[in-house]
Amino acid sequence: MTLLTETLSNIRPVDAGLMAQAQARLDNKTKPIGSLGRLEEFARRTVAISGSLDPSTAKKAIFTFAADHGVVEEGVSAFPKEVTVQMVFNFLKGGAGINVLANHVGADVLVVDMGIDHDFGDTPGLIDRKVARGTRNMAKGPAMTREEAVTALEAGIELACGCKADGVAMAGTGEMGIGNTTAASAIIAAFSGKTVADVTHRGTGINDAALAKKVTIIEQALAVNRPDPKDPIDVLAKVGGLEIAGIAGLVLGCAANRIPVVVDGFISTAGALIACELCPTVKEYIFAAHESVEIGHRFMLERIGAEPILDLHLRLGEGTGAALAMGLIEAGVKILKEMATFAEAGVEKGRDQ
């Protein structure tokens, strides 16, 4: 049995009984029933996912997966692919947006090389899971082989298993890869059947002419590769990315290990979508951090049945939205654990409570 097959077989529905118990506890806190809105949802879902009425949120980790994309040679991005490796060094030095926001919520940032076209050698702090030096140009053929896609998926699963061993209570996804909005748009187009134009946006800020070219290139990639929407690994291999595969694997591994996973924006949700297509139960373990301004993101969220926590017009990636959402999820859990009950506070209940 492969690691992927074993992981899929270990994913079970969350504990609905514990979720109900958590809500009963929340209803007995010193507040009108339901008055803390989605914070209560975050608390009861964390309980159901973790399998504990006293879930920890002490240790949080955000995985920023990085890889290059061969399709960049078609001119689909405003930035050259060299920016991928440059930003990885920025992450490692602590100077990026994700570093600032992760520090803000007390989360660790773990940077993973899934497929960057650069020889890092023994770079301190970088997790080496390189499958290839980037994908191939999907406009001309498959982005990767099926074997490469599975290897990248299993690398993400292994990282999730490491989270379990290290006592990580909440994981987050992030990414870096010039050209990866092209891959994400291709993935949602393949699964949804929507036109490429309906799911493709400006990514790093391309102009109208470049956007039109990006749409054409994605249409070409789909026509050349004909990814099978009934086979998620086929979609991933033909029009995906190595960092997207790593994210998908992390999400699967978190579900198998009962770890809440906070999924960032458009590219991260492409990975989560692959995971959910492989095993629909996975969606029970996902918190959607935010809704990106990338127009294809809404269709992804709808397909996995996830309601985003935030809408801040974010489009950076890296895991920035996941970091912010983690703070709110943790706040909900603290309400469950730290807020007084009516009896403890000596406060009378309302007539309907």
Swiss-Prot record:
Q: Which SUPFAM superfamilies match?
A: Nicotinate mononucleotide:5,6-dimethylbenzimidazole phosphoribosyltransferase (CobT) (SSF52733)
- Describe the reaction catalysed, as an equation: 5,6-dimethylbenzimidazole + nicotinate beta-D-ribonucleotide = alpha-ribazole 5'-phosphate + nicotinate + H(+)
Q: Name one GO biological process term.
A: cobalamin biosynthetic process
EC number(s) on record?
2.4.2.21
Q: In which pathway does it act?
A: Nucleoside biosynthesis; alpha-ribazole biosynthesis; alpha-ribazole from 5,6-dimethylbenzimidazole: step 1/2
User: What's the family?
Assistant: Belongs to the CobT family.
Q: What is this protein called?
A: Nicotinate-nucleotide--dimethylbenzimidazole phosphoribosyltransferase
The organism named in the record is: Geobacter metallireducens (strain ATCC 53774 / DSM 7210 / GS-15)
